Amino acid sequence: MKQNIYSPLVSIIIPVYNGANYMREAIDSALAQTYKNIEIIVVNDGSKDETETIALSYGDKICYLYKENGGCGSALNCGIKNMKGKYFSWLSHDDVYYPNKIEHQINILNKLDNKDVIVYCGYELIDQKSHSLYCVKPDQRYSKEKLDISLFPLLHSLIHGCTLLIPSILFQKIGLFDESLKYTHDYDLWFKFFRVSSIYFDHEVLIKSRIHAAQTTNTALNQLEEYEDLWSGFLKKLTKEEMIMIKGSTHQFLSDIAVFLKKNGYIKSYQLALAMTDQKIIGGFYTSIITEIIYSLRRHGINTTITKIYKWIRKSRK
């Protein structure tokens, strides 16, 4: 009996703001996908250059949408609201897909029972002239077992949004991008998704991510403040169980993430991680004492236990 091949519609969404220099290469890479059951939605976020002229030159090969400028998150949301696909795939206007990006990820889904898993991979960095710089391969640093743990790759800054293939149902269940966030709208939403969804790391490199001068126009201070809020929010929202799942213990998780935050200059978040580490240590200390007291009461009775407590107090004052 011939096995049914899973071939759902995939929506490739390309948000563009003043992207005339690179967007044609991005659109061409989407059109060149070996997987053909796709729709390509280009969202013009109020561009003032030749973005519209370039987009319209593709005719009915793409779905073109125009909106007033509102930021990348709002442009992505516009595309999501208009897409028909069972899966969402983001392509930045200055990035490029490998021809087999979508096909390869759908082939992975064909091998999995759970079709609502988020698939992601590594990526290649290129310069403004499309010359290759180097590849970012998370599996060179971590095992696949760790890379398949929900939240692990996100909290190690291993996720590039354009590598993801996301089930559309997650937008229906969780929501869309927070349009008030200019720099962290992606990780803010991935955090919500990864807490409720299984993830699957694939070792293939399937996209090219471009580095160019136009990306440095944002003020560093504004970015820093938003990233500080992002990481502080993560720390406050994570449960004890999630920390243990990621690092084996809450203390190890907080210690490791404190190092990461300090290294990346997120001082406020770093200080919060240190404070939480101290709280966990103190909390664990008192929990240990209470456990010892209960054990002593059950085994030795109240008089012996009181004597032990007195000795503990004297010892702690030395």
Swiss-Prot record:
GO-annotated molecular function: hexosyltransferase activity
GO biological process: biosynthetic process
InterPro entries found in the cross-reference section: Glyco_trans_2-like (IPR001173), Nucleotide-diphossugar_trans (IPR029044)
Residue spans crossing the bilayer: none
Gene3D superfamilies referenced in this protein's UniProt entry, alphabetically: Spore Coat Polysaccharide Biosynthesis Protein SpsA, Chain A
Superkingdom of origin: Bacteria
Alphabetical keyword list: Glycosyltransferase, Transferase
Enzyme Commission designation: 2.4.-.-
The protein's enzyme class: transferase
Family of the protein in this entry: Belongs to the glycosyltransferase 2 family.
PANTHER family named in the record: GLYCOSYLTRANSFERASE, UDP-GLCNAC:BETAGAL BETA-1,3-N-ACETYLGLUCOSAMINYLTRANSFERASE-LIKE PROTEIN 1
This protein's name: Uncharacterized glycosyltransferase RP339
